[in-house]
Amino acid sequence: MGNLELIVEKHSERIHHGLEVLPNLRHGLPEGLGNKRWTAELILATYEMALTGDLPKNGLEYKTGNSGGGFDVLGWKNNGSAKVESDKIDLSIELNKRDDGKKITIPLPIYGGGMSFGSISLNFMLARARAAKRLNTFMSTGEGGYPDDIVPYRDHVITQVATGMFGVREETIQYAPIVEFKYAQGAKPGLGGHLLADKVTSEVAKMRESSMFTSLYSPFPFHSVYSVEDHKKHVDWIKTVNPRALVSVKVSTPTDVDMVAIGSYHAGANIIHIDGGYGGTGAAPEIAKKNIAMPVEYAIPKVHDYLMSEGVRDEIVLIASGGIRTADDIAKAIALGADGCVVATAEAIAVGCTHCGNCERGRGCQVGITTTDPELSRFIEPEWGETRIVNLFTAWSKRLRSILAGFGLENVRDLRGRRDLLVRYK
Amino acid sequence: MPSKYERFKIETKPAPHVYQIPNKFDVSARKVRLAAMLVHEAFEYKLNKEVVLSRPCIYGVFGGRFGGFKPLKHKCVGCMRCVQEYPHIMTVKHSDSYKRLGDSFWTPEAVFTILNEASTGKIPVKGMGYKGAFGGEGFDGIWTDMSEIVRPTRDGVYGREYISTSVDVGRKPTSVDFSKIDRASSTIEIPVPIIFDKLSAGNGDVRAAVGMAAEKLGTFYVSRERTPFDFGQESLIPIGNEEGIEDLVERPPAIVEYDAEKSDLFEKLASRLPSSIVIARLPLREDSGMIACKLAHEGVHGLHLYADYHGQDYSKEPQHISASLKEVHQQLVKGGLRDQVTLIASGGITLAEHVPKAIICGADLVGIDTTVLVALQAEFRGETRDRANCQLKPRKIDPEWGAQRLVNLFGVWHDQLIEILSAMGIRDVRRLRGDIGRSMMDAELRELSFKGIAWAT
């Protein structure tokens, strides 16, 4: 074994060992770890769940962060002991509520969000795809194209069509059970994707049909869409290329997000996916993350209520993302009116992300998640990553079942819009 | 007017910190354990030096001669990989000197943001999502709107359709008077909606830097005293008083302010300085709306409303400048006066996002104050809130360096203003003024969205 192999092996083992050891708090809570949204405890609790597939038993906070608002000031009504047996609870949701088109059901109200090749490593992408297959759910390609290595998992891969149109080809649309239009992203609403020059390696450039080491800023908006009618043409285009595909429309959360949702419904979308302002990104101007568009906690009830008032709520799936960190966040999002959630950052945390925010840099991520560096990428072995993501979702499903059991609900679909089960904290 | 069309752009260039800034992170190793680990690894990897000494940091923190025994702390970005690999040896935390930066209003993060913007002239772009508090008071409780499918388009930072950040300062007539149509405009156009407000403290070098920067940027700076320098005179907004009128008449400024609370100088200034724009300077209080309407009726060309340096107004029960501004703006609108006068707001406008938010609340443009001193690496010696006793002490600087830092700051804020405007689908910052419908308030949304959810008992 050459030195490079030994070095990668050494650090890989050490990192993996650290992820096992840190949550037991033998060395205390690392002082520099975490922030108000992803607290140190929440990060360590996620490591623990990714390791064991179970909820932390040592008192680590795994339900909420410390941001002082949104999901963090919502809790559950005191509901006493479980009223339904956990194993009888159904967590599955439908992703197509229209009469026509293929029926797709996922066993958990969760699928993986778009993280593009280039913004993340191929190994992490593979780990996500493998986990999606094992869980019988989905992950999204993000806008960076469709690497050949994930084709074997195509039944569980959502092809994203974003404004840069990177890697959007007839076959990648035909592979997809679901095609996702990304109109906007919560972390940088109205601004289009950013992939800074250092991460545009030859492989990334080839996939995106661009020049190496040149920053790639996706346009905003789609230059072919300036109305709901234009949007319908987009939907028709996908359904012509792949009539079996469901269409998801990913939008940000402007003040008229309810109008956007109803427009998407009338254009023929199966899923309206709202991505709140506190979502993740591989790179975004800091000003965009905090200040543009509303958090998803406020957008969900607005959209849900409006779709109800229009009488179409049961014909379209409402998916929420952008700051969904825990099983409790998912359940709260559903109680506020969503059908299910998309998560991405939590998957990254499961494989060792510390939410340090250095993803945009040259070599990118120190633990091989958001990097295109061939050496660093090897820290995430796809099989190892798959296991951790599956474990995390397994632990989350236990928590979801426990919440539902307490309220005597046998089906996660019955939780939708049940704001009466929530309480607010000051 | 330039002879050929040129898109407005502020040219930035690096102006590195002159005074050392604190390391953000403090990384340290338990030395005995580190030594033991090295011995252990030496055995494990059979003295393979390259493998044993390969370090758990891609940023070079342990790249110095003594590796982990003497980490290069300034290189640490807080990625925590060393802690992940060696939790029994390594500690990374925010450094004490970083945590001490600023005061009760200026957070260490805000100070670092301004220092880096002034130094690099580049928009802060980072990976991962937002890390801070959910909403908050004042500007933190406001989100700007965006639009999914509108123009102007954005193809990269500079490849977008043009968005104007120009604003007009001065009184605007309510109707066209054809008898005066050949006269020069009574307003002045500024390419960015930001001026430099009067500084609480400053040495000659700081004043020179501000004057030079204002001149380069085509904006203005407010000062009580005229600078003794050759540059920046055209960009100066003096604060006039009774005794100084004759001096002003000798060299009429384009814009002049006066303390409207202390004196009723408008008539005098307007008659003696007919070519100048006369702005009444007022502290924001509960009655500011009424006073603003009265002054606007009397004919002032503009109002400069200021809060304290933490953005709190001077009411008996202080409220944030965002709330007071809205009240003044709305009273002027109700009185049919808003389009006639210019509103300048200052106090607590310290970060790039505060500019569009203050404009949404009703200002035409803003004045910045403590941010200028922070960009010029002034020293925090206590609270900065009080305008008369602000504990932000300027250091000795090279005026050229200082001017470049301020140009960089404006360049970065201009670019960030454009990011906000483009996300909203607005082509002209003038259209943002008072457009509360294109913003979202935390307090309002919370009540709407969480309606019916019981309070925990």
Residues covered by each model-derived region:
Chain A
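Active-site or pore-adjacent capping/gating segments
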Residues: 352-419, 423-424
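Solvent-exposed, flexible loop/coil residues
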Residues: 78, 97-99, 108-110, 119, ...
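Glycine-rich phosphate/ribose-binding loops and adjacent secondary-structure elements
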Residues: 159, 217-381
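Glycine-rich loops and low-complexity Gly/Arg-rich segments
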Residues: 135-139, 164-167, 182-186, 204-209, ...
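Electropositive phosphate-/nucleotide-binding environments in soluble metabolic enzymes
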Residues: 122, 126, 225-232, 293-297, ...
